[in-house]
Amino acid sequence: MMDLFKTDIMPDLQSSMMASIGSNWRFALFVAATLLTSYIVIVRPLKNVLFHPLRKYPGPKLFAGSSIPYGFWYMTGKWHTKIRQLHATYGPVVRIGPDELSYACPEAWEDIYGRYVPAKRKENPKPVWYCSPDAHDMVGASLGDHGRMRRVMTPGFTYSAMCKQEPLIKVHVDLFLEKLRGVCDDGNATVNMLEWFTYCTFDLIGDLSFGEPFGCLENSMLHPWLQLVFANIYVTHIILLCKRIPFFYLFLPIKTTLQLYRDFNRHVILLRQVVERRLSLTTPRNDFLDIMTSKKTSTLYLTNEEIFKNAILLTGGGAETTSSSLTGMAFILTTRPDVKKRIVEELHATFPNEEAINMRSVAQLTYTGAFIEEAMRYYPPGPNTMWRTTPAGGNTILGDYIPENTIIGIPHRVLYRSEAYWKHADEIHPERWLPDGQRPAEFDHDRREGFQPFSYGPRACIAMNLAYAEMRYILARFLWNFDIQETEQSKHWMDNQKAYLVWDKPGLFVRLKPVAKEEAQ
């Protein structure tokens, strides 16, 4: 009987026990998964809506409960349209995430982006998922490192420095105009001005930042590194979204992303070689690298890694925003012949010949300058928010205490198109930017101080003055040499564009007719 018990009954009992244990584990896992899912899907969103410190701020409950709705809108590239709808519905301050507030009012610039004031206001840092303080560039640098880098680099963006850089800049603008004459076929061919403005600005800024141009104008094509950047605008911004909201890693194309990292790393090696080649030169070039490497002291210096990273930053940030703005201006000029006519008249009333047009003299072009401001208001190069987070201990924004780790920011396009602050906000009126006495009275109450396309405060774009001078100079010489006309292909160019940190733009196809020499005198 004992033998029978061992051979027959024990295996059955053991099998039964193992089945029971397996069943219990499966049940336990099921319960745990159910509880976790319930917490994520139901409990946490309800907690965010009903008990979160930001619950008093207006906004859709769906967005207050979870960051997922925002993330999906951002993925579509249409967040700039959605956030405008939300502000139109809920007002100037909207809760767009469990821990995020969007401000669309001019008064918020100082509180969100203003400088650190001891015993009064702390600086709101950039989120680490947006700009890492370990990136060795000015964008994400700590308060102390940012101040050191900016003091080193500021002399490269003064009026005096710009005058010294002008001969180098002129070389690229001359080549830009020469190439356009070759491709326009006397107005019979369509020309993609997005491409040509991009070639020009990247060659120009690349030469100032790296010591040599990318060869875009010479070769009539983008450098492979720039091709990589522009071909992957969507993926790079989804990677940024994933760093913020890990849920969206589910939507990241893994194969494309891995290839992107490999390609970027390969180009980084090549760019480092370019910088090393430039730093080995002993002849002064009056470029950004001259400034970055001059007058080193124990407190005023840039490391080699900071030199390299800031060169990339100046190239990408400076060239893309300028080319985007110039392309937007070109489109507007094709749709507003009255504005184009007035700019051309101002050019010929101001300058006796093209040789008189330079980066200093274009400052006197009042209406042209007003047009540039209006074009950037209507079509800002960075349409969405440049994020900040409240520091440890929180901060005061517009008189209200905002708890720490709250994401805050101002969506540029929303603020610049708000009828609350701009007369005829969805129309183009360069005259709103004319000086007092020349400006029509209907625009006197526009909130022009709310227009900050290069950001605000101590971390505003260091190259802002150079960018304005560049745009005036390129636009003036472009319109001195060419008449620009729209094509059916790009008649609705601004409609339905996608936007992330920058616009994801289609080509702008226009017709260019060279202006006869006798007409341009």
Swiss-Prot record:
Keyword Iron on entry: yes
Glycan attachment points: 188
Entry keyword set: Glycoprotein, Heme, Iron, Membrane, Metal-binding, Monooxygenase, Oxidoreductase, Transmembrane, Transmembrane helix
CC cofactor: heme
Protein residues bound to heme: 461
Superkingdom, taxonomy of origin: Eukaryota
Function text: Cytochrome P450 monooxygenase; part of the gene cluster that mediates the biosynthesis of betaenones, phytotoxic polyketides involved in leaf spot disease in sugar beets. The first step of the pathway is the synthesis of dehydroprobetaenone I by the polyketide synthase bet1 and the enoyl reductase bet3 via condensation of one acetyl-CoA starter unit with 7 malonyl-CoA units and 5 methylations. The C-terminal reductase (R) domain of bet1 catalyzes the reductive release of the polyketide chain.
Annotated protein name in UniProt: Cytochrome P450 monooxygenase bet2
